[in-house]
Amino acid sequence: MENYCILGNPNVGKTSLFNALTGSYEYIGNWSGVTVEKKVGKLKENVGQLIDLPGTYDLSPISKDETVVTDYLLNDSFSGIINIVDASQLKRNMQLTVQLLELNQPIYIGLNMIDVATKRGIKIDYHKLMKKLKTPIFPVVARTGKGTKHLLGEIKHLGEGYQPHFKINYGEKIEETIKNMCQIIMTETSHDKYQARFIAIQFLLNNMQIANELNSEVVNKLSSLRDQVAEQVEAVSVRREMERIRNHYIETLLQDVVTYPDEDKQYFSSRIDKILTHKYIGMPIFLAIMWLIFQTTFTWIGTPLSDQLDAFIGGTFTDSVKTIMNYLGVIPFLQDLITDGIIAGVGSVLVFVPQIVVLFFFISLLEDSGYMARIAVLMDRIMESFGLSGKSFIPMIIGFGCNVPSIMAARSIENEKERLTTILIAPFMSCSARLPVYALFVGIFFKENQSLVVLSLYVLGIIMAFLVSTVLTKTVLKNDNAIFIVELPTYRVPSIKTLWRSTWEKAKGFVRKAGTFIFGGSVVIWLLSYVGPHGINVNINQSFLHMVGSFFGMLVQPLGFGTWQAGATLVPGFLAKEVIVSSMAIIYSSGDAGLVNVIQNQFTPLSAYAFMIFILLYIPCVSTVAAIRKETYSWKWTALAVAYPLVTAYVLTFIFYQVGHLFV
């Protein structure tokens, strides 16, 4: 099967095009850094495989995700490249395009966002550009799918009759050096003359990834030639001179191809940015927007729908299952397991799906509109005080959905110590798995202020992440503040299709988790409550679960929720935070009183909020721990990532409850 790779700058629509060409769905965000590892999909019509590579501005990598790109181009086999460029930022995008053309591999150029360019008054004669580059160009709007069908039909012809032809003349002295380098590379390696020229050019540009691919003897010879030509060129460095020549080539190339409107015209984005990124009112606006989202999720839409679903699962559905089991003569043990264990446990989590869907819809709306990238800029000013940059906030925002992709997104951070710091604080971001816990408790104890209480927990998670990052960056991970440079995407009206797919995929992941982790956890919790030292079908107060819960309940006694039931829910929370709610449903619903009544009797508003603080901050789930181990390659950092949140959660919850107890 033929392999084709898709490449481009960050946030030019690579993943949107990938989804359109393969019919699959990968996470899309209107900001840079969404793709951090290569993703493989099967092209429609069995054309071949398409590999979506992380966005990069240059083939000389400065972050882990960009290393994936260069490594793939050098070491993997592919039939051609699809280079997608932003038509509204064509000059900047051509920097990468020129480097890809220097590979002299079959290539198509996808001219994306032509709708945005047209709205800005930018006119592009792509036919003329195609003739100049001698490379096929396909205008597309990846977000809506316009033009992608034509591109798909042509991909199978990519490479047919291709003849390497692209070459930029870097001047007599540099060209002579490139020629000498090519001779060494072709003699010492298996690369042909076109690959050798590309390697020589990248080596002169100080691409360390290229140097790592060559043996030390070749590197020494090439370094000697690079040092020699550095003394001959009149520029500050060979790299600067080559970049100047390349920029001149691009300017000449686009001179009669692109027509821009008057520079005095102020775009809609610029006017809005002055308000939304204002250093004084930008943050209050963001908090107000988040409050509206939580108000909609927990008061106006989400909770009423969840109540209806809860009534159905706990009433009609459960009664129907019981009737069917009685009719079939199912043994009492299995009846109890299914109704009191599986349905009670899994159902108690599934009832929050409407709230999850509403929250994910609005988060996706903010992402696709381009607003979230502005928040990263806004937060950069604040995060500098805590030893981080705005680039760390992008993974943190992703963490509101799930901490695992949040940790993976840290690959886009160039500074290694900042990347590691971001990984260690990412679990403090309140992921969707914690939402059922919040929804349960705020619905019982804080009915009038549900959105404010949940918002306070999200803000608390961010504050704690900042405080911990301050400690880390001033001690074990001390580093200089990195400069945050980010391209602000154009504001756009989100695509209904994109919003639906994004919301559906996230909600589907939540439901899938209910059918695996939560199902398994519910069965185990119920069995532990059913079995004890004296046999089976024992009173829950004589069960193994009671024994385990009593031990942990004693440990958290000073935190305000020191019952054995609460203690028993904390242990399976390591598996997945949603299991906390399913465990409560099984434990608290085992008696005659309902779940809500028992929780009201065992918690107060103060201890309920203390419990939510502890759930927010204590150990990450097992999937997050695995992701931390994978990204840090260290058991030491992984152990720290498990231990310090537990200590932090205990200390902060203790202080909150004990101080609060003095006033309540």
From Swiss-Prot:
CDD domains per record: FeoB
Record-listed GTP 2 binding positions: G33, V34, T35, V36, E37
Binding site residues for GTP: N112, M113, I114, D115, V141, A142, R143
Pfam families in the record: FeoB_C, FeoB_Cyto, FeoB_N, Gate
Subcellular location, record wording: Cell membrane
Keyword Repeat attributed: no
Domain FeoB-type G: 1-161
GO terms assigned for molecular function: ferrous iron transmembrane transporter activity; GTP binding
Principal cellular location given in the protein's record: membrane
Cross-referenced InterPro entries: Fe2_transport_prot-B, Fe2_transport_prot_B_C, FeoB_Cyto, FeoB_GTPase, G_FEOB_dom, Gate_dom, P-loop_NTPase
GO cellular component: plasma membrane
Keyword annotations: Cell membrane, GTP-binding, Ion transport, Iron, Iron transport, Membrane, Nucleotide-binding, Transmembrane, Transmembrane helix, Transport
Function text: Probable transporter of a GTP-driven Fe(2+) uptake system.
NCBIfam families: feoB
Family assignment from sequence similarity: Belongs to the TRAFAC class TrmE-Era-EngA-EngB-Septin-like GTPase superfamily. FeoB GTPase (TC 9.A.8) family.
This protein's name: Fe(2+) transporter FeoB
Gene: feoB
